[in-house]
Amino acid sequence: MKKTLMLLVMVVALVILPFFINHGGEYGGSDGEAESQIQALAPQYKPWFQPLYEPASGEIESLLFTLQGSLGAAVIFYILGYCKGKQRRDDRA
């Protein structure tokens, strides 16, 4: 019971704390930050290629990023579940 309560408090703290840390700060993507650093270090640098698809807005970009992560997690956990089920089946036999 004590361990469960402690874990619950930690989860709640992890959810609530980001609202108070760096309040009002600007959050940018790592791609934009990398681009500005490259331009500062090597202004003559030219990208190798252009993106195949440029999302219309930041919201769509976030949606696609989230969908990609969700699909990846689904594949990983499907494989883990399949292996676990196969192991249980083999243990019973």
Swiss-Prot record:
Pathway annotation from the record: Cofactor biosynthesis; adenosylcobalamin biosynthesis
GO terms, biological process: cobalamin biosynthetic process
Keyword Nucleotide-binding found: no
Subcellular compartments: Cell inner membrane
Pfam families: CbiN (PF02553)
Descriptive protein name: Cobalt transport protein CbiN
HAMAP family attached to this UniProt entry: CbiN
GO molecular function: cobalt ion transmembrane transporter activity
Highest taxon above the source species: Bacteria
GO cellular component, one term: plasma membrane
Alphabetically ordered keywords of this record: Cell inner membrane, Cell membrane, Cobalamin biosynthesis, Cobalt, Cobalt transport, Ion transport, Membrane, Transmembrane, Transmembrane helix, Transport
Entry's family note: Belongs to the CbiN family.
Gene that encodes it: cbiN
Taxonomic lineage of the native organism: Bacteria, Pseudomonadati, Pseudomonadota, Gammaproteobacteria, Enterobacterales
Annotated NCBIfam families: cbiN, PRK02898.1
Record's bilayer topology term: Multi-pass membrane protein
Subunit comment: Forms an energy-coupling factor (ECF) transporter complex composed of an ATP-binding protein (A component, CbiO), a transmembrane protein (T component, CbiQ) and 2 possible substrate-capture proteins (S components, CbiM and CbiN) of unknown stoichimetry.
